[in-house]
């Protein structure tokens, strides 16, 4: 999250006239992230997040806000979009689509342990199953076609070795995406960006037997219909990684994957192609971080991410493919 479009007190007052949320108590920009303009909004009725969409169009937005509503109705803890006075879930602010959603309980866990990975794995599988009957379709907009368009734009900014890796991995992924194995992988709505800063944890209730409690997943604005295994790979590549080296942390990865498959067991095809999908998940974020780093947009409070982090992860996944754990109950 970031702030590309500033919102004055007068702007906010006019915007809030379309909502039955009481009086504004506090309003401030959120500095993290790189895609939309985001603000914490506190009113006399509760805590919310206002998002101005910098790239998504009004025609694309119903997929995202309706998906959150759908998941919330199916018991998945996600932000619920707040309806305006005309019943719609988003409007226009400074000529761009904008929406208000409820703020989830809890705080991000930026140094996750095994117990956090168990919670995330189980809920990710529940989210995938809950989305099976979601009627709208929107492809993952940061998948293979976007990689093909973006790699030539960033190629002038990287070393010869990096360019060879970018182009070689693009060819590898194109072949993977064209395979019968890929076509047969289970699919549906995916978060596509479930990093550790896009989930919140709250204090566990006493006597539940759990040391942590997942407050929910948020920031669904990179979501799209994709292979569920891609969503799992993106999640594992962030939650279960040794930050200095990019290597997988075996204990956390095993915990997350076993927890996931207690809800939705992996297919034989998913097991066979896990290594390729880990590489796809790493490649997607290396490409996007290179693009955001070398071709940034003007923004207030923008903090671009280090592209080198996902380059290290990609190289690690190429060298060490890994395997999905065998099916048995998660401890």
UniProtKB/Swiss-Prot annotation:
CDD domains recorded: HomoserineK_II
Swiss-Prot/TrEMBL catalytic activity: L-homoserine + ATP = O-phospho-L-homoserine + ADP + H(+)
Molecular-function GO term, any one: ATP binding
Pathway field: Amino-acid biosynthesis; L-threonine biosynthesis; L-threonine from L-aspartate: step 4/5
Keyword Secreted on entry: no
InterPro entries reported for this sequence: Aminoglycoside_PTrfase (IPR002575), Homoserine_kinase_II (IPR005280), Kinase-like_dom_sf (IPR011009), Pseudomonas-type_ThrB (IPR050249)
EC numbers, comma separated: 2.7.1.39
Domain of life (superkingdom): Bacteria
Gene3D superfamilies, A to Z: 3.90.1200.10, Phosphorylase Kinase, domain 1
Enzyme class: transferase
Keyword Cytoplasm: no
UniProt-listed GO biological process terms: threonine biosynthetic process
UniProt entry keywords in alphabetical sequence: Amino-acid biosynthesis, ATP-binding, Kinase, Nucleotide-binding, Threonine biosynthesis, Transferase
One Pfam family, short name: APH
PANTHER family assigned: AMINOGLYCOSIDE PHOSPHOTRANSFERASE DOMAIN-CONTAINING PROTEIN, AMINOGLYCOSIDE PHOSPHOTRANSFERASE DOMAIN-CONTAINING PROTEIN-RELATED
Family of this protein: Belongs to the pseudomonas-type ThrB family.
Name used for this protein in its record: Homoserine kinase
Organism: Burkholderia mallei (strain ATCC 23344)
């Amino acid at each position: 999250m970031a702030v590309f479009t500033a919102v004055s007190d007068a702007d906010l007052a006019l915007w809030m006239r379309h909502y039955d949320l009481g009086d504004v108590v506090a309003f401030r920009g959120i500095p993290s992230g790189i895609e939309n303009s985001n603000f914490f909004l506190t009113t006399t009725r509760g805590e919310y997040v206002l998002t101005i969409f910098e790239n998504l169009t009004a025609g694309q937005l119903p997929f995202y806000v309706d998906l959150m509503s759908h998941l919330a109705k199916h018991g998945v803890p996600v932000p619920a979009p707040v309806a305006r006075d005309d019943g719609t879930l988003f409007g226009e602010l400074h000529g761009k689509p904008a929406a208000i959603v409820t703020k989830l309980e809890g705080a991000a866990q930026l140094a996750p342990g095994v117990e956090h990975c168990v919670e995330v794995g189980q809920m990710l599988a529940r989210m995938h199953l809950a989305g099976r009957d979601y009627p709208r379709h929107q492809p993952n907009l940061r998948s293979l076609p976007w990689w093909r368009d973006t790699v030539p734009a960033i190629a002038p900014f990287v070393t010869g070795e990096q360019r060879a890796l970018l182009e070689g991995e693009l060819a590898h992924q194109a072949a993977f995406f064209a395979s019968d194995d890929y076509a047969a992988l289970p699919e549906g709505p995916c978060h596509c960006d479930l990093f550790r800063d896009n989930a919140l944890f709250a204090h566990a209730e006493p006597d539940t037997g759990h040391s942590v409690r997942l407050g929910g997943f948020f920031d669904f604005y990179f979501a799209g219909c994709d292979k569920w295994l891609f969503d799992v790979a993106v999640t594992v590549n962030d939650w279960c990684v040794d930050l200095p080296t990019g290597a997988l942390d075996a204990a956390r990865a095993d915990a997350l994957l076993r927890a996931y498959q207690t809800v939705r067991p992996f297919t034989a095809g998913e097991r066979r192609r896990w290594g390729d999908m880990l590489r796809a998940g790493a490649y997607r974020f290396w490409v996007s971080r290179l693009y955001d780093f070398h071709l940034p947009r003007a923004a207030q409070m923008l903090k671009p991410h280090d592209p080198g982090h996902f380059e290290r992860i990609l190289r690690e996944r190429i060298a060490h493919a890994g395997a999905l754990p065998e099916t048995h109950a998660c401890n």
